[in-house]
């Protein structure tokens, strides 16, 4: 019994000793200095590649390029600090029937009368004496610079005093009597008063339009602006300015006749000459069409005023809203016997086009319709309603010059505020170049206001400013939130960044520990 227990004890001791022997771990051999150096070089090489190659590539491919913009200049233009639009219109007085002394005295007294009545310094009439025995030609009104003559006044002796505006030139014929000529010692005369009143009445609409444009800008005015029926009609009728327009001339008939109409010759005779005169303002393209079995939106013999807006059947008539890059102006001839309440046969649709109703018997003679369309086109473009055609076109060019200059300045200011409000927005080099070109054109337009060159520079400034503001590549990163960026970088930073960072930290601790032991 005793011997058996001793054997059991010896077996247990043997098993325990074997267990203790098996559980004992063997220490790894110490690292050689070569292996430590190799491990450090491997970790260092990874970080060198990341810092010298990876980070620069990442920075160059993800950085948002922002070209430098002249923000101060852009803001100054928007606030009206650089240019105050001024239109010094030159009026030439041709007085061959008067002596040089009397003619100069008339110019002097009339200029004083105009200056005393002028309450709008941005629109100033400057009188000058026209050369004697010098005939008036169209070239005097198309020099292109700001020194061109806006109007020539021809004084013609007559039995009564009256005024007549030339239909084909910017010439105002004033007929006067000998009793109305100012004497040398007089500061005023009936002729002086008459010329002053005629000039103020002739340029009143232009003065009102320019005053309205300046009142809607950031430019300070010395006079208080008041709205008028002219402004309300002008702003509601005219179309938004565009460098190009498309004109569509349509013939709509409720039956199958007529199958042809002399539109080609009518356009060549009445519309194309007008478009040539309008070429400095905008470019125009034309197309024509005939639509059979076209029923109007309102079928009554007498069209009331409230029916005019419903007459055009936009649901069934093939009227394209726009062709090409510019807006479309629609001119419609409807074959029918109806008329507008009051006896009219035509009406203007604001910011859209015009409609003329012609009986079937008059469809071969399109002269009345084309003349109406020409008048409607000028109204849609913003030309004044009074005056001869050359005078109206000159007024339109000056008003557009002011409008485009102010619009380009406002667009530059909006672009400056946008770049400051959105630091993450990209600004390509093309935007900076467009801003530079726009500012250069603005300076040239401001110096040449009143002439065709000023209008051309204003068009260029507005075009470059709009092109820079609506650059598509600027908004590419605006709608890419930071959460999306984190989702893109996490798969890269997790598997690669964590092991490299942990390895570098462990190696740094080991190096510090070895330095401590050596000390």
What residue spans do the PLM features occupy?
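Membrane-proximal extracellular juxtamembrane segment immediately upstream
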Residues: 395-486, 494
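Intrinsically disordered, low-complexity regulatory segments enriched
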Residues: 63-64, 82, 322, 352, ...
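C-terminal single-pass membrane-anchor helix
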Residues: 483-518
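Short, flexible/disordered secondary-structure transition segments
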Residues: 285, 419, 472-479, 504, ...
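A positional/structural detector of protein chain ends, strongest at the extreme C-terminus
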Residues: 1-4, 517-519
């Amino acid at each position: 019994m005793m011997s058996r227990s001793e054997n059991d004890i010896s077996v247990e001791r043997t098993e325990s000793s074997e267990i203790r022997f098996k559980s004992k771990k063997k220490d790894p051999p110490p690292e050689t200095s070569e292996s430590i150096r190799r491990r450090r070089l491997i970790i260092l090489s990874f970080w060198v590649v990341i810092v010298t190659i990876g980070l620069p590539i990442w920075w160059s491919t993800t950085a948002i390029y922002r070209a430098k913009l002249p923000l101060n200049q852009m803001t100054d233009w928007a606030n009206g600090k650089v240019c105050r639009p001024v239109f010094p219109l030159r009026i030439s007085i041709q007085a061959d029937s008067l002596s040089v002394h009397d003619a100069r005295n008339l110019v002097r007294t009339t200029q004083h009368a105009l200056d005393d009545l002028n309450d709008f310094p941005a629109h100033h009439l400057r009188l000058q004496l026209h050369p004697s025995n010098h005939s008036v030609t169209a070239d005097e009104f198309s020099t292109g610079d700001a020194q061109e003559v806006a109007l020539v006044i021809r004084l013609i002796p007559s039995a009564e005093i009256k005024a007549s505006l030339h239909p084909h030139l910017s010439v105002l014929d004033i007929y006067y009597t000998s009793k109305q000529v100012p004497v040398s010692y007089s500061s005023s005369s009936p002729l002086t008063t008459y010329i002053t009143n005629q000039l103020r009445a002739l340029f009143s609409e232009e003065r009102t339009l320019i005053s309205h444009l300046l009142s809607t800008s950031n430019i300070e005015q010395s006079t208080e602006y008041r709205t008028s029926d002219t402004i309300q009609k002008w702003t509601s009728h005219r179309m938004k300015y565009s460098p190009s327009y498309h004109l569509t001339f349509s013939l709509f008939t409720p039956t199958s006749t007529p199958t042809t109409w002399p539109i080609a010759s009518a356009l060549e005779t009445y519309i194309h000459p007008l478009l040539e005169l309008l070429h400095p303002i905008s470019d125009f393209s034309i197309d024509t069409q005939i639509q059979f079995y076209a029923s109007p939106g309102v079928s009554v013999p007498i069209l009331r005023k409230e029916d005019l807006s419903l007459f055009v059947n936009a649901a069934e008539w093939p009227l394209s809203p726009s062709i090409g890059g510019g807006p479309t102006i629609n001119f419609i001839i409807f074959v029918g016997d109806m008329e507008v309440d009051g006896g009219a046969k035509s009406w203007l649709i604001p910011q859209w086009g015009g409609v003329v109703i012609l009986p079937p018997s008059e469809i071969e003679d399109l002269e009345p319709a084309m003349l109406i369309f020409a008048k409607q086109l000028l109204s849609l473009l913003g030309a004044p309603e009074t005056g001869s055609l050359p005078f109206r076109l000159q007024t339109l060019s000056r008003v557009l010059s002011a409008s485009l200059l102010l619009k380009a300045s406002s667009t530059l200011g909006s672009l400056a505020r946008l770049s400051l409000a959105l630091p993450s927005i990209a600004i390509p080099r093309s935007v900076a170049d467009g801003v530079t070109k726009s500012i250069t054109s603005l300076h040239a337009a401001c110096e040449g206001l009143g002439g065709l060159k000023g209008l051309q520079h204003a068009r260029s400034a507005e075009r470059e400013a709009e092109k820079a503001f609506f650059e598509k590549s600027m908004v590419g990163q605006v709608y890419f939130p930071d959460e999306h960026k984190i989702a893109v970088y996490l798969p890269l930073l997790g598997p690669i960044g964590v092991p490299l960072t942990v390895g570098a930290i462990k190696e740094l601790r080991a190096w510090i520990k070895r330095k401590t032991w050596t000390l």
